[in-house]
Structure formats: structure tokens, C-alpha cells
Regions:
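Conserved lysine of the Walker
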Residues: 14
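N-terminal phosphate/diphosphate-binding loop that engages ATP/GTP or pyrophosphate donors
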Residues: 23-96
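ATP-dependent NMP and nucleoside kinases share a basic, alpha-helical "lid"
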Residues: 92-176
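P-loop (Walker A) phosphate-binding loop of NTP-binding proteins
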Residues: 9
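Hydrophobic anchor at the beta1->P-loop junction of P-loop NTPases
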Residues: 4-6
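Hydrophobic positions on the alpha1 helix immediately C-terminal to the Walker A/P-loop
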Residues: 17
Length: 203
């Protein structure tokens, strides 16, 4: 099995590049950013307060752990039809809402939550080595934060995508106008948030 790990800052084109590669080679596609968004959606759905400067990290961690260990979560790895489900409900569009976008960092910045997600991501990657997996054992393209440095530092292919800030901001704004649900987020603000919990270059 070939593992391709693609990392980089917000708005650089990780998703479109990753899906194109997976489609070309017949690999599975794993959007780890969507997994973090799904966790934020789940916490909000469970009535957890994610507003304000202080959040209950233990409550968030317990909710996320239940989300994954309680068989509530699933992710589709078909690059043509990637999906996220919670208790059988397709929430692929719901996790791209402005409400989720504005709260996802409150969940993703909780270190124990990241540990849960990293373990889950590694499990999904390992699953593709099986002959009866989506890729029939060929491989997987995984994209998102920590992929090249923490989740799969030993991947056969590791890619760091970069682009100028103004280019990334233009892409984000264009996605918002096109209705992609990313809300035209400020990539500079996202960079600052990411820098607190992830390093693209340190393996």
C-alpha cells in the first residue's frame, strides 16, 4: 500500500489536489479536516457550549471519544463522493456551515481530542492496506493538519503545499462565493490558530 500525506496551510488547495490524486491512482481519500469539523458539529449537537474564551475541555474530550468509540461516526473515502455520517445521518454539508466553522478551533485545539483524532486517522489509513478495502489495498491520500509530521510521518510520499497568503485568501473567498460553506475565513487568522497546535515542518 502507498500512503500519500498532504499538508499545508488553509486555502492552499489540499482537498482538490488530494482528491485528484486519489481519483487518478484509484486510492482512497481521507479528509482529516472534515473529521475535526464533524467533532465540532457533534459537540454542538450534544448541547456543549463552545462559545466564550473558556470551554469545558473534559466535556469536549468525552463527547469526542464517545463519537468515535460509540460507533456514531463514519467517513466515506471515495474521492468522488467523500462523506461524513453521524448515527447514519449524512452531515457532509452541515459540517461546512458557518456555525461549525466558527467553533471548530475550540474543539481541535483541545490536545486530548487531537489524540483521539490521530488514532482514528491512523486506523482509517491502515484499513486501506486490506484487499477488500475501498482502494483494494492500493493506497490512500490523506490530507490535513499533522498528517505529514504526526499522523503519518513515515508515509511513502509526503507533500507540503504552499502558496502566497493573498492567493490562499482569494481561493477561500471564491469558495465562499461558490457556496462551499467555508465562510470566506481569514487565512491569516487560521494560520495563527494552527501555529499554536501544529507544525508543518517538524517531523
Amino acid at each position: 500500500m502507498i500512503r500519500v500525506a498532504i499538508d499545508g496551510p488553509a486555502g492552499v488547495g489540499k482537498s482538490s489536489t488530494s482528491k485528484a490524486l486519489a481519483r487518478h491512482f484509484g486510492f482512497a481519500y481521507l479528509d482529516t479536516g472534515a473529521m475535526y469539523r464533524a467533532c465540532a458539529w457533534w459537540c454542538l449537537h450534544q448541547g456543549i457550549d463552545l462559545d466564550g474564551d473558556q470551554v469545558d475541555e473534559q466535556q469536549i474530550t468525552e463527547a469526542v471519544a464517545e463519537f468515535f468509540t460509540g460507533d456514531h461516526f463514519d467517513i466515506g473515502v471515495d474521492p468522488d463522493h467523500p462523506s461524513i455520517t453521524a448515527d447514519g445521518e449524512d452531515i457532509s454539508e452541515a459540517i461546512r456551515s458557518s456555525e461549525v466553522s466558527s467553533h471548530v478551533s475550540k474543539v481541535s485545539n483541545v490536545i486530548p481530542v487531537r489524540h483521539v483524532l490521530i488514532a482514528a486517522q491512523r486506523a482509517y489509513i491502515a484499513r486501506e492496506s486490506a484487499a477488500d478495502s475501498f482502494s483494494l489495498g492500493r493506497g490512500i491520500v490523506a490530507e490535513g493538519r499533522d498528517i505529514t509530521t504526526i499522523v503519518a510521518p513515515d508515509a511513502e510520499v509526503r507533500v507540503l503545499l504552499t502558496a502566497r497568503e493573498e492567493v490562499r485568501q482569494a481561493r477561500r473567498t471564491g469558495q465562499a462565493v461558490a457556496g462551499a460553506g467555508v465562510g470566506g475565513e481569514d487565512v491569516a487568522a487560521r494560520d495563527r490558530a494552527d501555529s499554536k497546535v501544529t507544525s508543518f515542518l517538524t517531523a
